[in-house]
Amino acid sequence: MAEQKSTNMWNWEVTGFESKKSPSSEEGVHRTPSSMLRRYSIPKNSLPPHSSELASKVQSLKDKVQLAKDDYVGLRQEATDLQEYSNAKLERVTRYLGVLADKSRKLDQYALETEARISPLINEKKRLFNDLLTTKGNVKVFCRARPLFEDEGPSIIEFPDNCTIRVNTSDDTLSNPKKEFEFDRVYGPQVGQASLFSDVQPFVQSALDGSNVSIFAYGQTHAGKTYTMEGSNQDRGLYARCFEELMDLANSDSTSASQFSFSVSVFELYNEQVRDLLSGCQSNLPKINMGLRESVIELSQEKVDNPSEFMRVLNSAFQNRGNDKSKSTVTHLIVSIHICYSNTITRENVISKLSLVDLAGSEGLTVEDDNGDHVTDLLHVTNSISALGDVLSSLTSKRDTIPYENSFLTRILADSLGGSSKTLMIVNICPSARNLSEIMSCLNYAARARNTVPSLGNRDTIKKWRDVANDARKEVLEKERENQRLKQEVTGLKQALKEANDQCVLLYNEVQRAWRVSFTLQSDLKSENAMVVDKHKIEKEQNFQLRNQIAQLLQLEQEQKLQAQQQDSTIQNLQSKVKDLESQLSKALKSDMTRSRDPLEPQPRAAENTLDSSAVTKKLEEELKKRDALIERLHEENEKLFDRLTEKSVASSTQVSSPSSKASPTVQPADVDSAGTLPSSVDKNEGTITLVKSSSELVKTTPAGEYLTAALNDFDPEQYEGLAAIADGANKLLMLVLAAVIKAGASREHEILAEIRDSVFSFIRKMEPRRVMDTMLVSRVRILYIRSLLARSPELQSIKVSPVERFLEKPYTGRTRSSSGSSSPGRSPVRYYDEQIYGFKVNLKPEKKSKLVSVVSRIRGHDQDTGRQQVTGGKLREIQDEAKSFAIGNKPLAALFVHTPAGELQRQIRSWLAESFEFLSVTADDVSGVTTGQLELLSTAIMDGWMAGVGAAVPPHTDALGQLLSEYAKRVYTSQMQHLKDIAGTLASEEAEDAGQVAKLRSALESVDHKRRKILQQMRSDAALFTLEEGSSPVQNPSTAAEDSRLASLISLDAILKQVKEITRQASVHVLSKSKKKALLESLDELNERMPSLLDVDHPCAQREIDTAHQLVETIPEQEDNLQDEKRPSIDSISSTETDVSQWNVLQFNTGGSSAPFIIKCGANSNSELVIKADARIQEPKGGEIVRVVPRPSVLENMSLEEMKQVFGQLPEALSSLALARTADGTRARYSRLYRTLAMKVPSLRDLVGELEKGGVLKDTKST
């Protein structure tokens, strides 16, 4: 296998898993280069040193030059193709933009014409509204009385009607102490702000229409002026309500060519001095001039666009005004809303103004005992209010001269008081007896402003009898209304009682039925509830058992670890004892040798020492056997979990033959049957490709999956103390994942993996930097997901991996390796053919036996030269650590683990060890099985080291298995995209013969495009499978420019064919008028002009359909538009006579009034025409039904009303009564709506209705 070098450029080919080929087979096979790199090798012994090096450089330069030339030619051809394609696209876009520009110009012209027609109507509406508002004059006076407080005593005000207020003066000198005043509107204490504003609203409308409007709040202090203008938070006053009404009216009246803008000015008038309340808010506000020429003032104005901004500006002005109540009672507050209307079409600009004035208190007119500055303030207030009254009185009496110059207030508001402006004064009074003088003063002032005279005493009698007559008249009207209302209530109650009885019967039946259904549902619910409870109990017990098993497994693992540690310590102690014994034995041997020189030393003493050393050796062998048994038990428990996961693969895969170390290097090491690939569980006939479900798809959830997902997502390392606790928690979660997959079984293995996939990969990425996870557990989890991907992806199952002997190396072999002289095992790069694999060097040497072992062997009768290798625990740990270092980041080795079952892989490693190290082989004398145990220990150590290494991450990259999973997923996505690309290319090259094939091709291309976009979306969201940097796309998206162009061409072709079909349908008559025939031919010519927007492959179909329609229209006879027989149209001339209908649909029409409802049956014939069946006469329902074909609305386009009546005279009377109107345009509009209603009732004609609506045939409005 070859390992690709890491570069900064993307390579979309998954390298390292191609089949190995012998040198002889590679010579005749053409391979497409996957990158710009080339490998060139020349044998060293074929050329002299200098000449061979020079020749290799020259050949390399020639190859690079040729490669550059080929790339240049290819790039030049691509640039030419791209230029042609861009020119075609630009030309098509230019034509499309031209069409859009023409349509835009037509729409603008239509908008101008519409605005020109509407503008006079709007102006006329404004004029009529202002005339209606000023029928009784431009000045109106309203009177409002506020509610009394508890300490103010009784009220002296009465309200005879809505326009009269009566004051009880309690003057006994008069014959009638009550005085009455008439105003335009009178409001009692019970009237709220909303009712008041409903009468003020016309003035706001007039201001928006272009008139200047002023609204005054007048009255004594504490009479309710400020409340009327400002209101409260719950009941707002005129300020907020007027502006909101202006905004609502402006939004409803604004168009694309006209708009309104609003600005606000707030100032107060104190002692004839103006104070701008907005000048302190912002320094750069625009200015506006107000008042007459002699008294012009400059004020700040702020633009407002909504009610909230208006209230913000108003509150800011109130804050600048201050809270001095003594000053506010003698100050006039003016809020001016400036309205600007502009129309870009008529170039009309209208500016108007709405002034809301909160006047000072009117009690200043009667105060006489004040002195000092306050008297001056009161005099100014008296002067301004009196001048305002004079101006209003002059306006209502229509005098020639209006005294605006008498007060600064009237001079400022002069443009809002005279001329065409409107003025409203709201008089606020307090109905308490203690305020009688102020009440009379306010009412007299208001009456003088309105130019009315209060009632006198000598007219009291007349007024009294007039009131009596009015009361009597009102009472009679009320009695009549009450009588009529009671009659209507009786009739309604009778009808309601009848309907209620019917409803009671129906409800009783429904209740009975509901009771039966409810009883059935309750019984079913109880049974289902019992089943759910039982199921919950069973699941709870299973969950509890599973937790107990996991706890037991964890406890057993801890105990096994403790036992292993104890065994290691025991072994170390025994080894130290062995060394002591060896030293003692050497001393004893030396002493024996010295004593053997002495002939008097007896021989049994030496035999006794030999027996003692043999006993010690036996004891040591027993301890070693116990340790081997314990290690074997731990190994079995460790492999038990992984063997269950790979049981399915082992059962279905073919046994791989053990590799021979003597095999020829040119022989293929693995074929399809012996590559260790997983069996495919998907159907390969259609080449379908599926990945593990992405997070965007709906994944089936299980209780175990939900528990594991929550546990993995909620795991927080910060909550643990120390790395040991974090590692213990993380490893327990990984073991739970493996246990959940085992419990799910082979049938639900993929579902549980897909359910917890995102959580598992997120957990692994989160814990990788901490380096606390057991990498063997990580490897097992990774292998589960890669094998799940292999089982669902056919194109991955043909991947071949190198045999295990390619990854193993004996020390001091003839293979090419690095120049390191270290004798310890490590990474040594070994090149096999065209691949680069690092071989793991297993450094094992036969050890020399000690004298003690030799003595024991001689005593037992064994040959001294047939000793066996003893592998210690330290040596096994050393091999395992070196194997782990070798496997870190080794993707070829990770592929070997994925594609080869664990048991088979360990067997191959054991076979290689037995063949490579003869001193570990089993001989006839080795009957104890120690050698077999040593091979098992060595193979297990290598397997464990490799398994731990391929699961270890090397920051900033993930582990080797994670990188392999990413490469496999990229290969699957690449295959999917290429498959869809091939399908789309095939469809794009097909030629459509008719409209049906066009629709099928368009639907197929749209379906392929939808699938491609779905795969792209899945790629972007599949973050768990890809470990890419900087968020770049993992798979190159093939260009779909040709397919997109064909799809756009098919869409245009489909639209052209639909229009041709509509023209053919309109031409399905016996005779056509000249104008109609000319219009149809022009439409066909326009379709011919749209042909360049299609691709060449679609031209024949479109041209054929257009030519057929053109010939059909040409063959139809034509007649003059103004022939005499055209004035008498008939049903036969405008529609076919086929009246055969397979199914009738019934509609009932009720025209109201005294006429009975009538029924019309509608259907469709074979020509897709609307056919109706109804009574010939409405008044004769039993006179017999007639069947007629209903003409389309386009037939009535050029007919007069009389001609339409003649057409409807041949149809049932019900149709003519529903369609005929007073005018021809109205009849066409009503008939269009009726035709749509009837046709939509027939399912086969609904598509026809849609086409007619798009073509503009069905119109609800009057046709021009």
Swiss-Prot record:
Disordered: region residues: 1-52, 588-615, 652-684, 1117-1136
Assembly notes: Homodimer and heterodimer with KCA1. Interacts with CDKA-1. Interacts with At4g14310.
GO function term, MF aspect, one: microtubule motor activity
Coiled-coil features, chain-numbered ranges: 53-84, 462-511, 545-592, 617-640
Name of the protein described by the UniProt record: Kinesin-like protein KIN-14B
Lineage: superkingdom: Eukaryota
Summary of the function given for this chain in its UniProt record: Kinesin-like protein required for chloroplast movements and anchor to the plasma membrane. Mediates chloroplast movement via chloroplast actin (cp-actin) filaments. Required for the chloroplast avoidance response under high intensity blue light. Mediates redundantly with CHUP1 the nuclear avoidance response under high intensity blue light. May be involved in division plane determination.
Gene3D superfamilies associated with the record: Kinesin motor domain (3.40.850.10)
Keyword Manganese: no
InterPro entries to which the protein is assigned, alphabetical: Kinesin-like_fam, Kinesin_motor_CS, Kinesin_motor_dom, Kinesin_motor_dom_sf, P-loop_NTPase
Biased composition regions of type Basic and acidic residues, renumbered to the chain: 18-30, 589-600
Taxonomic path: Eukaryota, Viridiplantae, Streptophyta, Embryophyta, Tracheophyta
GO CC annotations, alphabetized: cytosol; microtubule; plasma membrane
Composition bias type Polar residues, residue spans: 1-10
GO biological process: chloroplast accumulation movement; chloroplast avoidance movement; microtubule-based movement; nuclear migration along microfilament
